[in-house]
Amino acid sequence: MKKFNIKSLTLLIVLLPLIVNANNIDSHLLEQNDIAKYVAQSDTVGSFFERFSALLNYPIVVSKQAAKKRISGEFDLSNPEEMLEKLTLLVGLIWYKDGNALYIYDSGELISKVILLENISLNYLIQYLKDANLYDHRYPIRGNISDKTFYISGPPALVELVANTATLLDKQVSSIGTDKVNFGVIKLKNTFVSDRTYNMRGEDIVIPGVATVVERLLNNGKALSNRQAQNDPMPPFNITQKVSEDSNDFSFSSVTNSSILEDVSLIAYPETNSILVKGNDQQIQIIRDIITQLDVAKRHIELSLWIIDIDKSELNNLGVNWQGTASFGDSFGASFNMSSSASISTLDGNKFIASVMALNQKKKANVVSRPVILTQENIPAIFDNNRTFYVSLVGERNSSLEHVTYGTLINVIPRFSSRGQIEMSLTIEDGTGNSQSNYNYNNENTSVLPEVGRTKISTIARVPQGKSLLIGGYTHETNSNEIISIPFLSSIPVIGNVFKYKTSNISNIVRVFLIQPREIKESSYYNTAEYKSLISEREIQKTTQIIPSETTLLEDEKSLVSYLNY
């Protein structure tokens, strides 16, 4: 009996920790609909993230100061990244992930550092960190562009990593040789390496590529051809554009000796949108630095153009006054920006179009055309709807064939100004001619050419977000002939002409141009949490049963369906 009690007591002592541990696991990890939940009961930050490390697939390093804090509560582990963001915000922690480990610090451990670059530009350093997936947008690098000095504040692991990277890259550039000839390939991601040419009414507009720009820089502008010099695609605006945080207008103060860039060869390779560089290592590094700063992503702008003809009397009834005000009903008003070359106003385009559509039902307005063009900032968008007639010029010994082109031409060069407003350089040409298909001949048997009228508007305007630009207001006369007849009676042969008559009407038509600019932002990654309430279980089942032969789902698809059903 005594031996039995000793054995029982020994077995109880051995199994007691296992029983307690099993109960502890059951109380901490609860499985509900295949989604893990964790209940923390005054756990330290270190012990909490030890259990959390496997879900993130990263080793977690917790500082001593952060490890002193304790956490209590129930946590949903279905989305570890989201839970990490919320938890660190509530507890007062900061973190940084370098791709190999997750570093967690107390918010009081945040450090700052000012670093001076000598041989590389700030943009080159930022681009290097982004390419290596080391840059954290939560802790941006802020710097003085002209002095190549930057400031960074964040978790110690991030600050030390950026400082060490900047020092290493600076030393690499300073140790580059200047004697050995080498070759480099620089690939562009956001802009074109070769020149682009647009034709506008027989005139070529050349937008220089990066290769041409860099070559002009190396040759002190001597490579600029006469054709390109006469057709500058982007005239300078009078308003200074505010430099944004992501601006890449960095200086090159490190290149003080112009002889450094002598004997450098550049060749554009459009097939891969790359530039081939021949020179020593230092020259290649300088060219790479320049191209990196020029190769920036441009924002997209959608331009909706409305060409509208409105009866002059109805336009006055709409309340448009080109001298300063416009009103549409009792609840809307707009102020106008006057120009010496055109009448311009910024207004709510949707309300104006609604009024035009109402007049269109009464045949008092007509939408002549409505093209939609997608372009990039600082890139011209051209709409040209023209007609051409040809004239033969016959002399005593030679002859030639000339042409005259007229129609509607709209050339818009948009750019973003301060406060997100869209600034546009506009050139509008509207031409009309008589509709004679054949030439008339006078008594001397000489052809009488048709008459062509042109109206040209050139201006610069700034449009706030969500507003439209109204341009025009010039009047022209139109002649319209209409035959009015009595049904059935007018179709009787011979005597039917008595029951119909012809009317002529001369009206004054005002042509206006409405331009609606809109920024097209890049689509972000799909967040299933946003669509969770929109997709029902029945729709998911229909989606998975479209192809009967597919009886199984991939693991990612199973996770998505499980998450949406939760």
From Swiss-Prot:
Question: Which parts pass through the membrane?
Answer: none
Q: Which UniProt keywords apply?
A: Cell outer membrane, Membrane, Plasmid, Protein transport, Signal, Translocation, Transport, Virulence
What Pfam families does this protein map onto? Secretin, Secretin_N, T3S_SPI-1_N0
Record-linked Gene3D superfamilies: 3.30.1370.120, 3.55.50.30
GO cellular component terms listed in the entry, alphabetical order: cell outer membrane; type II protein secretion system complex; type III protein secretion system complex
What are the subcellular locations of this protein? Cell outer membrane
Question: Which InterPro entries does the record associate with it?
Answer: Bact_Secretion_Sys_Channel (IPR050810), NolW-like (IPR005644), NolW-like_sf (IPR038591), T2SS/T3SS_dom (IPR004846), T2SS_GspD_CS (IPR004845), T3S_SPI-1_N0 (IPR049034), T3SS_OM_pore_YscC (IPR003522)
Changing residue 296 to I has the effect of: In plasmid pCP301
Q: Which domain of life is it from?
A: Bacteria
The Gene Ontology biological process terms listed for this entry are: protein secretion by the type III secretion system
The UniProt disruption phenotype note reads: Inactivated mutant strain is unable to invade HeLa cells and to provoke keratoconjunctivitis in guinea-pigs.
Q: Which PROSITE patterns does the record match to this protein?
A: T2SP_D
**Residues of the signal sequence?**
1-22
Q: Which residues form a coiled coil?
A: none
| Chief location of this protein within or outside the cell | membrane
Q: How does it assemble?
A: The core secretion machinery of the T3SS is composed of approximately 20 different proteins, including cytoplasmic components, a base, an export apparatus and a needle. This subunit is part of the base, which anchors the injectisome in the bacterial cell envelope. Forms a stable homooligomeric complex. Interacts with the pilotin MxiM/SctG and the inner membrane ring outer protein MxiJ/SctJ.
Instruction: Supply the PANTHER family for this chain.
Output: PROBABLE GENERAL SECRETION PATHWAY PROTEIN D, SPI-1 TYPE 3 SECRETION SYSTEM SECRETIN
Indicate the family of this protein.
Answer: Belongs to the bacterial secretin family. T3SS SctC subfamily.
Write out the function statement from the record: Component of the type III secretion system (T3SS), also called injectisome, which is used to inject bacterial effector proteins into eukaryotic host cells. Forms a ring-shaped multimeric structure with an apparent central pore in the outer membrane. Necessary for the secretion of Ipa invasins.
Official protein name in the record: Type 3 secretion system secretin
